[in-house]
């Protein structure tokens, strides 16, 4: 049996990339981060390869699927949302912490279209991104719970309701930016926050989505963005 015929040993560490391969990988990730920021997660991979100065074949050798590229690019980006949630929990007044979290989340989405897309989607094969998002959702639950226990945030608001805030903000941002009103989200958020206050609460006409329904919706959006038909 030749060396080439021997089965690979999964316990052995992967060989480090050659210098040129590492340079290409870093260039692809940097280009993808900028293209996704500007155009969202459905941006053409050909444009990423062009900006990275590599051929599309090189891109696919490094990242055989869009999801693998997303996983490499987005984990650090999504971490910014985790830091916002941690800062929100450090604010003394629970309502101020809740409002801070929503405002900074919308601000991040306005600055980075790809990040906005990622926060409204689930990618079952992007382990690094999903691990960060799971940590984020734990922190956001604490932000909401703290504000509700203080009596300032309406008691019937759920985490699933907040998913709609993210979806709505992400989808409308490109249109209002093109219309010359990139900060229009601030007015919309102020109206939403007024509706979230406990003292202004009225009975809601429809039950919230269940966690399972929101998860399924986010998976559907993630599959569409990643071009995954399965």
Language-model segments: which ranges?
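Basic, helix-initiating cap at the start of DNA-binding domains
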Residues: 1-50, 68-71
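Short hydrophobic/aromatic patch on the recognition helix
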Residues: 53-63
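Hydrophobic alpha-helical connector segments
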Residues: 72, 79, 83-111, 124-139
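C-terminal peripheral helix-coil segments that are non-catalytic and often amphipathic
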Residues: 1-12, 138-149, 175-230
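Helix-turn-helix/winged-helix DNA-binding modules
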Residues: 40-41, 61, 154
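Short linear capping/connector segments at secondary-structure termini
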Residues: 117-126, 207-209
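Amphipathic alpha-helical packing segments from all-alpha helical-bundle domains
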Residues: 125-175, 182-187
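Amphipathic alpha-helical interaction segments
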Residues: 27, 47, 96-104, 161-165, ...
């Amino acid at each position: 049996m030749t060396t080439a015929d021997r089965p690979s040993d999964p316990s052995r560490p992967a060989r480090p990339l050659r210098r040129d391969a590492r340079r290409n990988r870093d260039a692809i990730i940097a280009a993808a981060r900028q293209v996704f920021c500007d155009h969202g997660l459905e941006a053409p991979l050909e444009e990423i390869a062009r900006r990275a100065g590599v051929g599309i074949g090189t891109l696919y050798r490094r990242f055989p699927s869009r999801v693998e590229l997303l996983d490499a690019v987005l984990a650090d980006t999504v971490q910014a949302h985790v830091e916002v949630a941690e800062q929100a929990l450090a604010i003394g007044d629970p309502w101020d912490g809740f409002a801070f979290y929503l405002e900074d989340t919308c601000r991040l989405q306005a600055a980075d279209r790809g990040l906005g897309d990622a926060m409204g989607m689930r990618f079952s094969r992007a382990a690094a991104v999903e691990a960060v998002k799971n940590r984020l959702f734990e922190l956001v639950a604490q932000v909401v719970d703290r504000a509700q226990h203080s009596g300032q945030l309406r008691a019937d608001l759920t985490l699933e309701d907040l998913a709609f805030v993210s979806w709505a903000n992400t989808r409308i941002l490109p249109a209002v930016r093109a219309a010359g009103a990139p900060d229009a989200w601030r007015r919309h958020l102020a109206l939403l926050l007024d509706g979230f206050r406990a003292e202004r609460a009225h009975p809601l006409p429809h039950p919230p989505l269940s966690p399972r329904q929101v998860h399924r919706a986010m998976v559907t959006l993630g599959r569409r963005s990643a071009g995954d038909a399965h």
